Swiss-Prot record:
Residues 1-510 are lumenal. This is Flavin-containing monooxygenase 1. It comes from the Eukaryota. FAD binds at residues 9-13, 32, 40-41, 61-62. The chain crosses the membrane at residues 511-531. NADP(+) binds at residues 60-61, 195-198. GO terms for biological process: energy homeostasis; negative regulation of fatty acid oxidation; response to lipopolysaccharide; taurine biosynthetic process; toxin metabolic process; xenobiotic metabolic process. Its EC number is 1.14.13.148, 1.14.13.8. The gene is Fmo1. It comes from Mus musculus. The keyword Transferase does not apply.
Length: 532
């Protein structure tokens, strides 16, 4: 029986894994190579080897209500989008609340994780670590790898002819910390993901000129969405997810395009995605269109050639003088402490069932947590993965035969990546909620909306039509949280409370009352059609 579990990494997913093990009676031991917990969210002035790095101004792209642990809401005085320093504070509050730090060995590097000679029977692993120069070895019944995928920068210099002749400065976005280096410089940022766009916008406040080069474009949305609410609380609902899955792709694409262009016309600003037939990960930035329209940021196509002090873009013969190039070209991932026979990474993909279990292992005692890029927050995603894994380790739920798991893995691999970043699976980008529900179903933790509609209709309607907040995931099943119902029904109150710092007297409107009545009737009709 699985008892002792090794956990690699004390970031968002590592902390969740420790807690999930503890609440099910397992004995977790977490190895963290740095001096403190927090992973990505712990800002340092210098880049640390083997640890994700962020810049000083990073703010969460998922809102507070959508990116908390399912049974541990953010403090109510936190802003709706959380700066990195407060996010780290939240993780420490989580660790303290559930007494997780007692399970963590800091300044400890995992050197190797290998199968024991009797692995086919025992499923055990030997974990070799180094702490302050001293090597240690221990045997564990299972391993949960929580190292993330933002530590190995992807810098494809051979894709940029002439880069080695460039006399200016160039570096990967992982190295970026502060915008001061751009003062009075001509800056080129390559790659229009979240980091690339953030850096270009920050640079535009100090630089002489800023170019943002993109190959495929992107949908750009603001954190502030309909009526001023957080974007994901409006966009990520079970009702909308159902529509996106049921409606024909051309209709979904048209609806998404119309919604994305309601802020600004992406074609007119030169940022529209080349492929608009699927919902790719949007770029979250509140300033970009304003910087473009005021001539502070110039959108450019891919690079044709780099010269000593300038760059030539495709389809634009003019040379643009450049002093600094920032490559926001994504990351690759690897597991240097694992043999390739355990987890093999090819073309930016690993053969992991549900992005978690190596499909070929005879014993499912090694799991990778957080190696996924859903269109939603990593915090509840990683926590749900960890919760599912612990149930598998306990034997409370079982995996399909290896052949079935490999079939799913191979089907996923057909989604080839483009651009410079990770291979983001189309299904998971579109169906974040579906992915979470799939894991919850296998541990009997998915909310039963049909039954709930009869016993608690207010909650059922809130779950179906309202934002898919993480509290849904701990409403039932093993490890359910008694505060989940209240958290769901009060989520909008908390969202408004933190912004409504000046009270304004609102006059009642009979029209609004009538509109609400008709809206309620429409909801009842929709529920009737969907559930009956």
């Amino acid at each position: 029986m699985v008892k002792r579990v090794a956990i690699v990494g004390a970031g968002v997913s590592g902390l969740a894994s420790i807690k999930c093990c503890l609440e099910e009676g397992l004995e977790p031991t977490c190895f963290e190579r740095s001096s403190d917990l927090g992973g990505l969210w712990r800002f340092t002035e210098h880049v640390e080897e083997g640890r994700a790095s962020l810049y000083k101004s990073v703010v969460s792209n998922s809102s507070r209500e959508m990116s908390c642990y399912p049974d541990f809401p953010f403090p109510e005085d936190y802003p709706n989008f959380v700066p990195n320093s407060l996010f780290l504070e939240y993780l420490k509050l989580y660790s303290t609340q559930f007494n997780l730090q007692r399970c963590i060995y800091f300044n400890t590097k995992v050197c190797s994780i290998t199968k024991r000679p009797d692995f086919a029977v025992s499923g055990q692993w030997e974990v070799v670590t180094v702490t302050n120069g001293k090597q240690n070895s221990a045997i564990f019944d299972a391993v949960m790898v929580c190292t993330g995928f933002l530590t190995n920068p992807h810098l494809p210099l051979d894709s940029f002819p002439g880069i080695l002749t460039f006399k200016g400065e160039y570096f990967h976005s992982r190295q970026y910390k502060h915008p001061d280096i751009f003062k009075d410089k001509r800056v080129l940022v390559v790659g229009m993901g979240n980091s690339g766009t953030d850096i270009a916008v920050e640079a535009s406040h100090l630089a002489k000129k800023v170019f943002l080069s993109t190959t495929g474009g992107a949908w750009v949305i603001s954190r502030v969405f309909d009526s001023g609410y957080p974007w994901d609380m409006i966009f990520m609902t079970r009702f909308q997810n159902m529509l996106r899955n049921l409606l024909p792709t051309p209709i979904v694409s048209w609806l998404i395009s119309k919604k994305m262009n309601s802020w600004f016309n992406h074609v007119n600003y030169g940022v529209a995605p080349e492929d608009r037939t699927q919902l790719r990960e949007p770029v979250l930035n509140d300033e970009l269109p304003g910087r473009i329209i005021t001539g502070k940021v110039f959108i450019k196509p891919s690079i044709k050639e780099v010269k000593e002090n300038s760059v030539v873009f495709n389809n634009t013969p003019k040379e643009e003088p450049i002093d600094i190039i920032v490559f926001a070209t994504g990351y690759t991932f690897a597991f240097p402490f694992l043999d390739e026979s355990v987890v093999k990474v090819e073309d930016g993909q690993a053969s992991l069932y549900k992005y978690i279990f190596p499909a070929h292992l005879p014993k499912p005692t090694l799991a990778v947590i957080g190696l996924i890029k859903p269109l939603g927050s990593m915090v509840p995603t990683g926590e749900t993965q960890a919760r599912w894994v612990v149930q598998v380790l306990k034997g409370a739920t079982t995996l399909p035969p290896p052949s079935v798991m490999m079939e799913e893995v191979n089907e996923r691999k057909k989604n080839k990546h483009s651009g410079f970043g990770l291979c983001y699976c189309k299904a998971l980008q579109t169906d974040y909620i579906t992915y979470i529900d799939d894991l919850l179903t296998s541990i009997n933790a998915k909310p039963d909306l049909r039954a709930m509609l009869l016993t608690d209709p207010r909650l059922a309607l809130s779950i179906f039509f309202g934002p898919c907040t993480p509290y849904h995931f701990r409403l039932t099943g093993p490890g359910k949280w008694e505060g989940a119902r209240k958290a769901i029904l009060t989520q909008w109150d908390r969202t408004v409370k933190v912004t409504k710092t000046r009270t304004i007297q609102e006059s009642p409107s009979s029209f609004e009352t009538l509109l609400k009545l008709f809206s309620f009737l429409a909801l009842l009709i929709a529920v009737f059609l969907i559930f009956l």
